[in-house]
Amino acid sequence: IMEKIKGYTSYIYLHVKGEPLIHPELDKILKIANSYNLNVNITTNARILKDKLDIIINNKIRQLNISLHSFDSLDEIEEILYVIDKISDSYISLRLWNNKDNSDILKLLERHYNKNITNDKRFTLGDNVFLDRDVLFSWPDINIDEISKYGTCKGGKNQLAILVDGTLVPCCLDNDGYNKLGNIFESDLESVLKSNNYRKIVNGFNNNILVSELCKRCGYIKRFKGGI
């Protein structure tokens, strides 16, 4: 896979859906990515981050995105903050993507980092450590009612996702492979980027039209200007 994507991107994100830190060959994957000089980004619930700390520190990780809303208690979050303090060579994005009252979590962050947190969507907590806030969104589901026919997205334009079986899809929210563009094990990226299916989806986004039935049922579309 690394051989096929080189020349097309300098960044890889080790997630579509699921927890990347539990992969049994995480260390091997990171070393392969590092050998291709790729910037690795990981999104994690961080529940086993302490156990995987040596792997994280001993490999080049550009950014760790940590979902703070996945924890059950403030004590768990506080423990993770001390683990994060040991990671000095990576950007850390602490995410609060929910519609709840996060005042207790914010107070904990203020104490730990000795900061008065503002209402900015992105707030700098420390060296390379950021708090990122946004509202909860609904994942795409082909079985729900249509949300909108109009909107745009970065899927396909700025990113492609590769599923475990090699299926290529426009974005990381399509974990079931509904918008299948091809397979990385069976074809090269150039042919995928020239395919009619890919061009239809991207041209639709460029014209504020949602071509895919799955995209019409995706709540994330509301985050982009033009989405309804």
Where are these regions (language model features)?
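Short, acidic, Ser/Thr-enriched surface-loop or helix-capping motifs
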Residues: 162-163
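Short hydrophobic/aromatic beta-strand element in the GNAT-like acyltransferase core
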Residues: 159
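Flexible mid-to-C-terminal extensions adjoining Fe-S/redox cofactors in radical SAM and related proteins
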Residues: 173-228
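Conserved glycine-rich "GG(E/T)P / GGGxP" loop and the immediately following alpha-helix
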Residues: 1-125
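Short, positively charged
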Residues: 128-148, 196-197
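Active-site-flanking alpha-helical
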Residues: 26, 171-172
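Short, small/polar residue-rich loop motifs at catalytic or cofactor-binding pockets
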Residues: 153-156
